[in-house]
C-alpha cells in the first residue's frame, strides 16, 4: 500500500515535468490603418510598391504563461507619384501555456513555433484592413520563422564571439 502511494507520488512529479503546450488565446493587441492621400489616391493610375516590416517579441506574463506578438507593418506607395496609398499595421498576439522545455527549446518555441501559428491571423487582419480601405488585395506570402530564428541566433552568436 505504501509502495503504491510512493509510485503515485512519483508519477505526479513526472506529470509536472512533462511537456505542456497549449494556445490559451489569440487576440489583436494593436491595429491601425491609414490612407493619408485618400481620395486622390483612387483617382490616379495605381502601380503599388509594397514595403513590409515583420517583427516578433515575447515575454513571460505568468507561471508557464507567455505572450508572443507578431507585428506586421505594410506600407504601400504608388510608383506613379510616390504618394503613400496606405499604411496597415497589426500586432497579433497569443497567450501560450508552455512547460517542461529546456531554455533553448523554450526560446525556439517562442521565437519560431508560436509566431508561425500567429502569422495567418495577422495576415488575415492586414487583408481585411486593406479590403475595407477599398484597395486591391494584399496577399502576404508565408513567412519562414524557422529561418528568421536561425538568422537571429547566428547574429547573436557572432556578436558574442566578437565581444570576446
From Swiss-Prot:
Primary localization: cytoplasm
Localisation per UniProt entry: Cytoplasm
GO CC annotation: cytoplasm
InterPro entries: SecB, SecB-like_sf
UniProt GO MF annotations: unfolded protein binding
GO biological process, one term: protein folding
Taxonomic superkingdom: Bacteria
Keywords per UniProt: Chaperone, Cytoplasm, Protein transport, Translocation, Transport
Pfam entry (one): SecB
Record-stated family: Belongs to the SecB family.
Role noted for this protein: One of the proteins required for the normal export of preproteins out of the cell cytoplasm. It is a molecular chaperone that binds to a subset of precursor proteins, maintaining them in a translocation-competent state. It also specifically binds to its receptor SecA.
Subunit structure comment from the entry: Homotetramer, a dimer of dimers. One homotetramer interacts with 1 SecA dimer.
PANTHER family the record matches: PROTEIN-EXPORT PROTEIN SECB, PTHR36918
The name this protein goes by in its record: Protein-export protein SecB
Organismal lineage: Bacteria, Pseudomonadati, Pseudomonadota, Gammaproteobacteria, Oceanospirillales
Amino acid at each position: 500500500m505504501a509502495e503504491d502511494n510512493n509510485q503515485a507520488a512519483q508519477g505526479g512529479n513526472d506529470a509536472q515535468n512533462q511537456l505542456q503546450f497549449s494556445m490559451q488565446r489569440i487576440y489583436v493587441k494593436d491595429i491601425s490603418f491609414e490612407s493619408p492621400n485618400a481620395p486622390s489616391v483612387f483617382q490616379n493610375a495605381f502601380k503599388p510598391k509594397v514595403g513590409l516590416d515583420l517583427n516578433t517579441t515575447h515575454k513571460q506574463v505568468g507561471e508557464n504563461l507567455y505572450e508572443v506578438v507578431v507585428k506586421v507593418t505594410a506600407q504601400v506607395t504608388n510608383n506613379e507619384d510616390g504618394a503613400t496609398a496606405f499604411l496597415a499595421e497589426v500586432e497579433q498576439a497569443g497567450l501560450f501555456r508552455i512547460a517542461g522545455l529546456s531554455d533553448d527549446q523554450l526560446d525556439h518555441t517562442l521565437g519560431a513555433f508560436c509566431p508561425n501559428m500567429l502569422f495567418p491571423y495577422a495576415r488575415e487582419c492586414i487583408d481585411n484592413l486593406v479590403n475595407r480601405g477599398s484597395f486591391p488585395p494584399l496577399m502576404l506570402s508565408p513567412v519562414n520563422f524557422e529561418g528568421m530564428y536561425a538568422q537571429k541566433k547566428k547574429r547573436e552568436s557572432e556578436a558574442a564571439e566578437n565581444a570576446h
